[in-house]
Amino acid sequence: QRQMCIRDRDASLHAVGLFDVQGKNVLYADQIFEPLYPASTTKIMTAYVALKYGNLDDIVTVSERATDFAEDEQVCGLQAGDQLSLRDLLNGLLLYSGNDCAVAIAEHVSGSVEAFVDKMNEEARNLGATGTHFVNPHGLQNEDHYTTAYDLYLMFNACLQNSQFVEMISQTSYTANLTSASGVPYTMTWEPTNYYASGDAAAPEGVKAVSYTHLRAHET
């Protein structure tokens, strides 16, 4: 495995890329091959793998591990023993950036988080994202967890070819149907954490925002 040197993160560390997808041209680039911590943009590849290998109608039982997050870490509020569909989990992942959803998805699709992460790395390489290495499906910081702006473009563009992904990230809210460990049905509603998707902010003039909740630079 390659060893990557990642500079200490600060406010000035950034990367910017502007891509012409149809013409397959890079219109603007600033440090697009610089290794950076991806934070919740990790969930782009989590969704890609889940959509490729999972069945959206499968019913998933949430494990204890999937609920084991600190109070200040973003979760959808799942409880151990909850049952909900893979479709519900993906919506919680993409709309509300649920780290609990990421782990539940990984365990269901591949049997374990570790096996799922192996698949994430394999699929990233298949897309040409050779400057990327994942160690978890949610993006919580780890020194060996990194990507580049160019690789993010490759992965996000691949996801945009999937109509189900586009539909999920375009919603203004989603209501999931769950059954608790004790067998009681209940619902949870999630709204986007992205200001553009929620309507709390407008895109610059002449720019159309294709919303992705977690396309940002700060730590999850």
Which residue stretches match the model-derived regions?
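Active-site-adjacent loops and short helices of periplasmic peptidoglycan-processing enzymes
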Residues: 3, 7-150, 159-163
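Penicillin-recognizing serine hydrolase domain
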Residues: 9-11, 112-219
